[in-house]
Amino acid sequence: MAIKDIHNFKNHDRPKVLVVLGTTSAGKTSLGVQLAYELNGEIISADSRQVYKGMDIGTGKDLGEYKVNGRKIKYHLIDVVSPSQKFDLAKYQKMAQLAIKDILQRGKLPIIVGGTGLYIQALVDNYQLSSAKPDLKKRAQLEKLSVPELFNKLVELKPEFATRLNNSDKNNPRRLIRYLEVIGSGNLEIDQRRKSPYNFLLLGLNLPDKILKVKITKRIVDRLEKEAMVSEVKNLQKNGVSWQRLESFGLEYKFIGQYLQDKFDYVTMIDKLSTASYRFAKRQKTWFKRWEKQGVDINWIKDQDGALKIINKWLAKP
């Protein structure tokens, strides 16, 4: 099924930007790539772990999918930093905004694809994030606290912001410390919003829980048995990524890392990873529902045909 209106997407007062969001294993990449092919678009990843180099299997980069009928689909915000480097919401927003401008300047459609809600929200709601400089004295004090203690501090100071964090952010001490620094800096509010210069259309892939659970299980098995996920974690650790750092990335990296440290056996690792992945998907659904209650309009779809019907109406509007 073809898109009716192929045109230069920057020729609007508010240029159009498409978003494809959803839970883990929902099929976001496949749909996003197909839409990019149909719409002459490019993908901007909105995944807090896909920015890291060498973390391919566990983050589901699926780079082999970025090709349709022999044509490569260009992507952005994938493989941009080392796993040992710091990467936060402000950096993501800045890089993604530059990618949006670049894509539009070339007359193509930016398509944001991912499941990290806060990354997507920072773009759609146009957060004005703080540029506060690190407070080394305060940072030294915060580094003595555990992850739960850091998160509880954030809840006390900025509850609305804290509840929007994804699991990766909640378990990442570096990010929690940075958020606390920004909030305590007295500079810009961490989530001050400005009117967006873009016309966003948000599509959400919504799979029934039973189907999603089957897909999550299959993905875990495939990653472990066919895609050498354990070897990926071994290589990351061998190349200097600490066990603690791997654990902060959550899910596959956390549980495979613990398995490699002999904290439990292989079967237990799969069981723990499966349970954590199902819970993660539920939290993602809850996060998007909460965002809808705040006023965002997410068009929930089941497949590509449903997406194209909504997109055609969106493109027909000036």
PLM features: residue spans?
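Phosphate/pyrophosphate-binding catalytic cores of soluble transferases and nucleic-acid-acting enzymes
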Residues: 1-318
